[in-house]
Amino acid sequence: AAPLMVPEKETKDMNMLILGMGTGTYATQCKKYFGDMQMEGVEIDKKITDLSRKYFSLPDDVKVTTYDGRAYLQAMDEKYDVIMVDAYQDITIPFQMSSEEFFSMVKEHLTDDGVMVVNMNMRGSGEGNINQYLSDTISSVFGNVYTVDVDGSTNRELFASDDADMMNVLQ
């Protein structure tokens, strides 16, 4: 959904950064539906990238840099239409990639109408759950935050942008 949220752009003119490439599932799906979009990923473990290409069909035209995602953002100036945060340490998002400072850095690397997507690998309900804390942190940085449960999965996707029109795509 994230590529559809960036208004008035052809997908060939869009670019996406994935922090925490893992097996490349998100990149593979985006290539399937938005094939001409420019896409790159950052994965801290080269062995994971090698496995993703060998066993999970990560497309060859998706550039993957072996680096820490937060350090990568700090080292570059590029702006993106979509930044996907999908980094995990065991089953949780690493602390250094779940703070206000980190999400502010992500925002600095988005275009004015850009969208950040965070893959939350578990659904939580009720007050005080980890997803609520993460949503509150992101809401302190972005003007618009929306979460969507992924059908047939335990995943929940969080979309964040300062562009209020992005909400219309999700409704």
Task: Tell what function each PLM region has.
Residues 1, 5-7, 144-171:
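Soluble small-group transferase modules, centered on the S-adenosyl donor enzyme superfamily
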Residues 1-117, 121, 125-135, 139-141, ...:
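The AdoMet/dcAdoMet-binding core of the Class I SAM-like
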